[in-house]
Amino acid sequence: MDKATRAVIQKATENARSCLETEFREQLDGRYDIRAGRPLPAEPGAHLDADQRRIHSQLVATLEHLRLRGANEQDAVDTYVREAAFTTLNRLAALKMLEARALVKPCVSNGPASTGFKEFSGLAPGLQELPDKGYRLYLECLFDEIAVEVKVLFDRRDPAALLWPRDAALAELLAILNRPELAIAWAEDETIGWIYQYFNSSAEREAMRKQSSVPRNSRELAVRNQFFTPRYVVEFLTDNTLGRTWYEMRAGQTRLTDQCQSLVHEPDERFDPP
């Protein structure tokens, strides 16, 4: 993947993170009365419906768990918002990549106008009565289906999936993911890896290093040292470890000499007899 494409992915990732974190903070504050740096509300507000009261209880339990692990009120909210944004972004990015490989019908590329959602709506006309015409339900059905094989990312029981972007934020997020200059990236296997890396900005990494010369917690350890490994590096390492071992075991008589482009070998190499 060239530098220009990586730059586009980085910009989109940073924009998407900002969009989602702003949205989820506003939801925590305005809907659930959960504010960074302040004690958690003991009871859900009277303005919440039954489903929102359930979500409120789960949010409080999740934040209390973070508190028990050593986070203060501010850090607990910050951590939750970051993880919720990370999970939502990566799920929709994964759907874009599945679309590019024709493994799912178009579901994100045109938002609610996607052909996959249109077919889904045709099977359940009652969805038109929902505020978003059932688009969220459609995406969650896709998550549940994919979670059978990729549970670690798509499991909706994950506390990081308690919040969902409202209409305006979802439209903004989809617009970011569907930028024309980003279209080429979705067919690339490396894209999801670069999104993982760019979610933590270099400015954030530098700020951590200025505050402490060594990582102070598990997140800082990951942010400081977690870098995506490009395909060519993986291929070189694999070709010259496993590939090289097999090459020597077969005394050079193997198809790997043609298949492993990074395998270091000489045409006239000699091998000791077994």
Each language-model region and where it sits:
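Preference for the N-terminal adenyl/adenosyl cofactor-binding alpha/beta module
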Residues: 1-274
